[in-house]
Amino acid sequence: MGARSSVLSGKKADELEKVRLRPGGKKKYMLKHVVWAANELDRFGLAESLLESKEGCQKILTVLEPLVPTGSENLKSLFNTVCVIWCIHAEEKVKHTEEAKQVVKRHLVVETGTADKMPATSRPTAPPSGRGGNYPVQQVGGNYVHLPLSPRTLNAWVKLVEEKKFGAEVVSGFQALSEGCTPYDINQMLNCVGEHQAAMQIIREIINEEAADWDVQHPQPGPLPAGQLREPSGSDIAGTTSTVEEQIQWMHRQQNPIPVGNIYRRWIQLGLQKCVRMYNPVNILDIKQGPKEPFQSYVDRFYKSLRAEQADPAVKNWMTQTPLIQNANPDCKLVLKGLGMNPTLEEMLTACQGVGGPGQKARLMAEALKEAFQPGPLPFAAAQQQGRRTVKCWNCGKEGHTAKQCKAPRRQGCWKCGKPGHQMAKCPERQVGFLGFGPWGKKPRNFPMAQIPQGLTPTAPPEMPTAPPVDPAADLLRSYMQLGKKQRESRKTPYKEVTEDLVHLNSLFG
C-alpha cells in the first residue's frame, strides 16, 4: 500500500484531499481512492506507474474515454478518479469531480488536436438545417454518407414507448429522436417496438392513407431517361420501394430537394397522435380537482390531458381559462375568483399554494371556533333584564358586592327584619312559599297564606257550620271495612275449645 499511495505525496496529496467527490457534497478524496484506482488499472492491462505523471494519466484517459458511455459504474468512477489525479499533476485548481472532468476534456481536445489534423475534405460536417437533418446523414469528402442509428437511440425510443404507454410525451420524444433521420432509420425505430402492435397497425393505416394522398397530389411523370433520379412516390417516402441512397439524394440534391425524412416523420406523428387519443380517452372537461388534491397536481393533470388534445390554439387558450377554474374544488375556486378576469397561471399557482393543507385547515378551524364561542345578540327584553341585574349585599345593603366580600362590621340578628333570636332563613316576615311556611305542626298548603297584621280583625261575618258533602266512595270503603271486621271476628275460635276437641279424640285409640 505504501508504494501505491506514493503516487501523490506531500503537497499533491494535500491538494487531492481538498477536492470533493460531488458538487456541494461533504465527502472528499482520500489516498484510499488512489489505491483503489491503482488496483482497477490491472483489469485493463495498464501499469500503476502511469498514475505518477501527467502524461501517464493522459494515456489512461485515452484508453478509458471511449468506454465511458457504455461502461459500468466502476469504470466511470475510475475515469473520474484519473481525471482528478491528472488535474493535480497539471496543477489545475478544481473543487469537485465534475469540474475536473470538464478541465480534462478541454485540455485533451486542445493538446491532441485530432480535429485539426484531419483533412478538410474528410472532416464530418452536418448539412444546413434548412436542407434536412444533420444526423445520421453526414458529409464526408464532399459526399453524403449514411450512418446507422446508434443502439442508445433505439434503446431510448423503446423505453419511452414502454414507460409512457403512448402518452402525450411519445410524440415529442419521437420528434427529438428522429431528427434528421431517413425513412429507413424511422422504419428501424418502428420495428424495434415489440409490444403495442395494435398501435403500430393504426400507424401503418395512417401511413397508407397519407401515401395514397401523396400519389394523388403528385402524379408520376412519364418514362425517364436512363440514369436520371425519379420523383419519390408515397411508397418511396415510406421507405418500402426506395433505397437509402435514393432517400439521401432526394433530401440533399441541388435542384428541388424533397425532405422525404421530414414528410415521413409528419405522417407518423399523425398516427402517434391518434394512438395518444386512443390510449388516453379521458376528456379534458372531465378532469376535476379532488377535495384534498393540491392545486399544482391538478394543474399538472389538466395540462397533461390538454397536451393530448388535438385542438386549435384558441380553443386550448379558452380551456386554460374557463374549465381550469370551473373544475377546481370549492376552496381553490373561491380563491381563483378573487383574482379577477383572466389571471395568469403563475398568479393562480401562487394564490392557491397551501389551499387545503394543514395551515389553511387550522385557520378555518380557528375562525369557526371564534364564531362558535362568540356570544350572539340577546333579545331586547333579556338585554334589559340582564342590564338591570346587580348584586346586593345583605350585610350593609349596598350594591356591587356580596356579604362575603363586605368590609363593614357584621350585622347581628336577622338580615331580613333586623330582630335578634333567629336567622333570615327562619324569619317569620319572609315571603311565604307556594306550600306555606313549612310542614311543621300542620299540613302543607297548596296556596299562599297571606299574613294578617296584628291588631286587625276580619270584618266579614263568620261562616256557618255545614255538613260535609257526601262522598260515595268513602261510604263504600267504610262499609267494606266494617264487613271485613265482622268476618275476622267470626273466624276467631277460642283456644280452649280447640284443645277440648283434641282431648276427646283419645277415646278413638282406646
Curated annotation (Swiss-Prot):
It comes from the Viruses. A lipid is attached at residue 2 (N-myristoyl glycine). Capsid protein p24 is phosphorylated. Residues 219-238 are annotated as: Disordered. One of its GO terms (cellular component) is host cell plasma membrane. One of its GO terms (biological process) is viral translational frameshifting. A motif (Nuclear export signal) lies at residues 16-22. A zinc finger (CCHC-type) spans 391-408, 412-429. One of its GO terms (molecular function) is zinc ion binding. Keywords: Capsid protein, Host cell membrane, Host cytoplasm, Host membrane, Host nucleus, Host-virus interaction, Lipoprotein, Membrane, Metal-binding, Myristate, Phosphoprotein, Repeat, RNA-binding, Viral budding, Viral budding via the host ESCRT complexes, Viral nucleoprotein, Viral release from host cell, Virion, Zinc, Zinc-finger. A motif (Nuclear localization signal) lies at residues 26-32. A motif (PTAP/PSAP motif) lies at residues 458-461. This is a macaque isolate. Belongs to the primate lentivirus group gag polyprotein family. Late-budding domains (L domains) are short sequence motifs essential for viral particle budding. They recruit proteins of the host ESCRT machinery (Endosomal Sorting Complex Required for Transport) or ESCRT-associated proteins. p6-gag contains two L domains: a PTAP/PSAP motif, which interacts with the UEV domain of TSG101 and an ALIX binding motif. This is Gag polyprotein. It comes from Simian immunodeficiency virus (isolate STM). The lineage of its organism: Viruses, Riboviria, Pararnavirae, Artverviricota, Revtraviricetes.
